[in-house]
Amino acid sequence: MASESKFAVLKEKERETRKQIVIESTLTLFSKKPFYEVGMRDVAEEAGVSPATLYRYFPSQEALFIESFLQDISSVAKEFESMIKKDEPASIEEFAVKFTNHLLDNESSFQMMTYLMLKDDLTNPAIGRFDSLTKVFFDLFSQLMERHGVVREDARLFSHSFIASITGIIMTFRNYSMRSREKVKSHINQLVRITASLYTKELLGE
C-alpha cells in the first residue's frame, strides 16, 4: 500500500514537471511574438509534444495562456514586493512607473491582460484565474499604501482606482500616433507620473 502511495506521488510530480515544461514553452513563445499569434500547435512544437498531449494538462488554450500569464505575473510580483518591503518603501510614482514599464516592455503580458479584461464570455475557471491575476497588483499597491500609513480600508479602495487608472492610460495611448515607440512610452510615463502625483497628494499629503 505504501509503495502504491509513493508511486502515485511520483506520477503527480512527473505530471507537474511536464505541465511546467508546457508553461515555460508558452512563455518562451510569448517573448518572441504577440500572444494572439501563438497557437496550441506552436506550444506543442516548442515543448516537443503532440497538440493532443497539451489537453491532458489544460482543458483549453485559454486556460493554458491564463496559467502562463499568472506564473509570469507572480514572478514579477516578487520585484514589487522587494520595493514595498524596503526600509524606505517605494514611492507611488516609483511603483507606477515600474508597473507601466513592465506592461509596455512585455507585449504579450499586456495583450493577455487586456484580452481578459475585455472578453465577455470567460468560463468560470478562467474568471477565477483572472481574479487572481488582478488581485496580485491590487494587493501589492494596497500593501504599499499601508506601508505609507494609509488605513487598510482606504488602501484597498484606492488600489482598485489606481491600477485601473494606470492600465487605462496604457490602453488609451499605447498606439498613439507619435513618431516612435520610445516617444509613446515617454508620453505614457509622463501621464502616469501626473496620475501618481495626484494620488500622492491625496493619500500622503505630499
What are the language-model segments listed below?
Residues 104-124, 171-178:
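Amphipathic alpha-helical segments used for helix-helix packing
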Residues 21, 29-63, 67:
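Helix-turn-helix
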Residues 15-27, 43, 68-72, 76:
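Generic hydrophobic, amphipathic alpha-helix propensity
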Residues 74-82, 123-149, 156-160, 186-189, ...:
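Amphipathic alpha-helical packing segments from all-alpha helical-bundle domains
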Residues 1-17, 203-206:
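N-terminal intrinsically disordered/low-complexity leader segments
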Residues 115, 146-193, 203-206:
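Hydrophobic/aromatic-rich alpha-helical bundle segments in the mid-to-C-terminal region
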Residues 67, 81-107, 158-162:
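Hydrophobic alpha-helical connector segments
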